[in-house]
Regions:
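Central antiparallel beta-sheet cores of small beta-barrel/beta-sandwich binding domains
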Residues: 1-75, 79-106
């Protein structure tokens, strides 16, 4: 199963909009984070309580920041925090419904 979320990450430079794509294989997660013109590889696990534990870089024009992100998923809404050596960033996101994904592909 693959899902896409429209996400907003509250970075030190202000809010950043992007798309988080997640593919589930049991409790294992792979995917990508398309943010500020860069596509970052995502991997992680889905915990028994429904929490997503993701590991990924966030690439910018000046650096690549390794992050650990913990997200709570409730009724198609994501909320959580990314932690890196230099910062903590709050996340919010909403599920992009399959019908909207199909229309945008046309």
């Amino acid at each position: 199963m693959t899902e896409q979320y429209q996400v907003t990450i509250q970075s030190q430079m202000g809010p950043r909009e992007g798309v988080l794509t997640l593919s589930y294989q049991g409790s294992y997660i792979t995917g990508s984070l398309d943010l500020v013109g860069y596509v970052n590889t995502v991997q992680g696990v889905l915990a028994e309580d429904g929490t997503l534990h993701l590991f990924h870089p966030i690439q910018t024009a000046v650096s690549t920041i390794p992050c650990e992100t913990v997200l709570n998923l409730r009724a198609g809404n994501l909320r959580g925090t990314s932690t890196s050596k230099s910062a903590r960033m709050r996340w919010e996101g909403t599920l992009i419904h399959p019908e909207a994904q199909e229309e945008s592909a046309l």
